[in-house]
Amino acid sequence: MEGAMTEPGKEMTHLDARGRLRMVDVSGKERTAREARAEATVEVSPETLTRISEGTIAKGNVYEAARIAGIMAAKRTWELIPLCHPLQVTGVEIEFSADPARNEIRILSRVKTLDRTGVEMEALVAAAHAGLTIYDMCKAVDRGIVIRDIRLLYKSGGKSGTFERA
């Protein structure tokens, strides 16, 4: 796998010269302000969306449970994703917006740090885990829930600069 490429001129940093996985050594990098934002979309039935907004799901407040789950997941990403570094997460925000016309809930996560590597994975894990928690909170009334479109929207800081999804 030597020279494995994702984009011209960019190598897979988690592979050594023989193609073996390794955790990238970031000890020589400076701590810099970094931020990442991600999203996930949860499709639910119209009845489920109404029950969530009215607060009548038996397990409790769906959005607050999902918010806490997303925050907790961001802080523990290094335990969930192999080769992720443990980071000093300095802030996590999780927001929800319901779209009754599409029977969807959009989850937006924002994660910040002052560290040696980025928080893209933390933002993605936060959004995904919030979506999984919505599923768990609502599965008794809606088995057809779909979690989709988990993706990075924005990242800043570090050597690779800023990325913003168009």
UniProtKB/Swiss-Prot annotation:
It holds the Pfam family MoaC. It comes from the Bacteria. Pathway: Cofactor biosynthesis; molybdopterin biosynthesis. GO terms for molecular function: cyclic pyranopterin monophosphate synthase activity. SUPFAM superfamilies: Molybdenum cofactor biosynthesis protein C, MoaC. The active site is at D136. Keywords: Lyase, Molybdenum cofactor biosynthesis. Substrate binds at L83, C84, H85, M121, E122. GO terms for biological process: Mo-molybdopterin cofactor biosynthetic process. Its EC number is 4.6.1.17. It catalyses: (8S)-3',8-cyclo-7,8-dihydroguanosine 5'-triphosphate = cyclic pyranopterin phosphate + diphosphate. Coiled coil: none annotated. The keyword Lyase applies. Belongs to the MoaC family. NCBIfam families: moaC, PRK09364.1. HAMAP family: MoaC_B. Catalyzes the conversion of (8S)-3',8-cyclo-7,8-dihydroguanosine 5'-triphosphate to cyclic pyranopterin monophosphate (cPMP). Homohexamer; trimer of dimers. This is Cyclic pyranopterin monophosphate synthase. It comes from Syntrophobacter fumaroxidans (strain DSM 10017 / MPOB). The gene is moaC.
